[in-house]
Amino acid sequence: MNCAANTAFANRQVITHQIREGFATVFGRSAEAMGMELVYDVAHNIAKVERYAEGDLVVHRKGATRAFGPGSLELPEIFRLTGQPVICGGSMETGSYLLVGTDRAVRDSFGSTMHGSGRTMSRAQAKRTFRGEQLQRQMKQQGIVVKAVSMSGLAEEAGLAYKNISEVVESVDRAGITKKVAEMRPIGNIKG
């Protein structure tokens, strides 16, 4: 598990580097000069040893991420007053949410919450159902720029291939597992 987690971390670092290099090429300034700093990084789909009232437990999060509340010693000091940031992705069309973990999440779900809205159909089904070119045009009409390596790959990410992000977020907010902080609307997407 540690090897897989390290590989995922390294992969995210490479992607971050490539994005910074792309911006530097386009804007003719270094990433540092533009203030392009990593704000937050977290793993999901991982197992970790964590301490709870029941003892030290291996918590496996599949389709989930950590959502520790304020005061948790598991958190870096910068987040101990607020609770853990939770980035909850929707689709390229609908946007995403920033949430924060709660004490209730620790009590009710071993400090876990979802990390995305979840799919309503498989990638293969989405490719059969949607056309990337049409999706790209629709998103352009909504003011969302999309760049994709392939149109079939883009079709996999159609908004209707995912659950309604607002409804999913509302359910965990009502349950007290996380609290809503901000809703983010897409203006641009890159699909590799």
Model-derived segments and spans:
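Domain-length cofactor-binding catalytic modules of enzymes
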Residues: 1-192
